[in-house]
């Protein structure tokens, strides 16, 4: 009997893939064209529909020297600021545990945090509305960095806010460091363990792990372009950066994470998810297109989605959740540059959504 049910599952997956045969062929061409135009060594693309993986392919290589092919189930990429969604989900879990109220002042949780001219809430910080500058003065991302958690309170005291909270959106990794400190205090552990225990382990996401400067065992390299050639990205220091970024993942584990968000009670309650993905507004009532750890907007074709992108030296990434269509798209690359990954996701999304309609 168990073989019969296994056969039905395989048959169902094959039928689903066949339903999207045209979209799959067009996606192959779109990705290949994008990869060739931008000289990207490796890309992983994974797509699910109604919680089923209908497309998962690797293009190119993870290492230009060894020619190791991209495997969407195994090849890990830097996901950069996509990590902010994991931090937001962790805060969402702490909200459900009555450990955090995002509408309260950050000073409620960090009593020793130096006072600024204006007060601001946890939600303001999560939506990049608090006026905090992008990165702390003195922090570097290369391996000459000496800035650490021990420096946070001193730098926060000396770094001025850019504007009155909620006046406008200003993207801030610095703010997510602050959120990480709140999580650590309310969770009672370091940020990566809190991510793991409250979110990642709930979905058995073993391939989403903290990044470090010692990833040689992965047989992965990350690239930038210099004088028209792909060269190795500089060493990345991840000290005190795991609330804002500095994770690696396979594209398929990002799909699992995304489906854990949209299907009820796998991770968080429906009302918690709605609170996190709802676009925030400025003092003047202008929608920012960003919730709490999630972009929340419409694509080029007018289809609503939420998700996050990520970019740093050696990576350009994005995932999108189209809730109305039950469609999830993840694209991870091992190169940074000025190419527009948004455009590729717009076109991939369009191909599948047109067939779903």
Task: Write out the residue ranges for each language-model feature.
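Extracytoplasmic/secreted proteins, especially bacterial periplasmic and envelope-associated proteins
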Residues: 22, 26-33, 42, 81, ...
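Glycine-rich phosphate/pyrophosphate-binding beta-alpha loops
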Residues: 239-248, 306-338
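Short active-site loop at a secondary-structure junction
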Residues: 34-44, 66-124, 163-174, 242-245, ...
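Residue-level signal for well-ordered, solvent-exposed loop/turn and beta-edge residues enriched
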Residues: 52-53, 99, 229, 327
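Short, surface-exposed loop or secondary-structure junction motifs
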Residues: 59, 117-311
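Short, conserved catalytic-motif segment at the N-terminal edge
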Residues: 20-77, 101-104, 158-159, 353
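Bacterial Sec-dependent N-terminal signal peptides
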Residues: 1-22
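Short, gly/Ser/Thr-rich active-site loops of penicillin-recognizing serine hydrolases
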Residues: 299, 335-357
